[in-house]
Every structure is written in structure tokens, then in C-alpha cells.
Amino acid sequence: SGIALYGDKLENREMVKNEGFYLLDATVLSATTIEEDDLLQNIALAIKENHKKVKIWNLSLSVKIAIEEDTFSDFGVVLDHLQKTYGVLIFKSGGNGGNFMKKLPKGKLYHGSDSLLSVVVGAINDERYASNYSRVGLGPKGTIKPDLASYGGELLLGDNGEMIMKGVKSFSRNGNIASSSGTSFATARISSL
């Protein structure tokens, strides 16, 4: 929410012209691990209970299973159903990967990122190229995913094999300015439009 509300100010540059808006914190994850079915039930309940006052949803989380080429994930199908049923729009993060640390090709988008109705968001760096960690499509049946990309920082492989972060500024849990990188940050920025 820090990036959605204050992203431009924190970066000291105009990217999306953040304006004030009503923000609902709909916690759908437990403090421990959660099964995909339970997560989907929590998301469905949050949308069902709040769809009349909240039309735009930022879903910056993933089930860490790569999408398939010919089959849509249950996660993606449920997200599409919820959007049709309740007249909402979901902005979904595409997911992060670390293949660049092993000099391997980028991984496929995660489950849920194959939703046809969701706006799936990847991350770009300061040079406006896809961030090293940002996962890629295509979606099932050749669908184009992600739909959009926005600034999400960058992770680099250093000369000594260490990870170097050029992060996005937001707020830490204790309210201090901190930085990190990820498609979740890019998704928050886009959903604030």
C-alpha cells in the first residue's frame, strides 16, 4: 500500500500520479503456510464481502507453481469467475524468480497469472527493461501475459556471485523508508492508476 499511495513521492519522480483513495486491507494469508484451495476461499470471501465498495483489487501474491502451456490453473479460473460474478478488476503480480543467479532463462509465470480477466503485471528496471527476476509468459493457449509492466526495481548477479538489489522505496513494517524489489511492487504501482 505504501507504493500505491506514496510511490511517486518516495521515488521523487512522477510515474503514476498517485492520488488519495480508499484502501481496504483484506488479509487472505495466514501467518503460516496455506494451501491453494484455502487461499482461494479467503480471496473469494474477501471479494464477496466487499465487492460493492471495492472494485479494484491488488493481489500481490502467488502460489509458486509455474503455469502450463495448455491448461489454465484453478487459481486463474477462480480469479476470472470472481471478476465476472462480482464486477471487480484484479491486478495480479506475475511472480519473481531467481534463475538469473544461476544464469538460467527466466521462469514461467506463477499460477493465477494465467487469469484472462486479471491485469497481470511484470516488473521493469530503471532502464525500462524487464527486471532479471520478473517471470514471463506466454500464458496457456498462447495468451499474452503479463499484460503490463511497471517499475519494480532490479536484482543483479554480482561479480562474486552475490545478489545486488536496486530496490523500490516503500515503507517497512515499523514505518521507516525501506527498499526491496519485486513484481508485487510493480503491481501496487499499476493498481493505483
Identify the meaning behind each predicted range:
Residues 25-28, 59, 123, 150:
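Hydrophobic side chains in beta-strands
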Residues 1-36, 87, 114-117, 139-145, ...:
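Subtilisin-like serine protease catalytic core
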Residues 108-191:
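Extracellular S/T/G-rich loop segment that most often corresponds to the catalytic His/Ser-adjacent loop
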Residues 28-115, 174-187:
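Substrate-binding/access-modulating region of protease and related hydrolase catalytic domains
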Residues 5-9, 150, 191-193:
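Short glycine/serine- and small hydrophobic-enriched flexible loop segments
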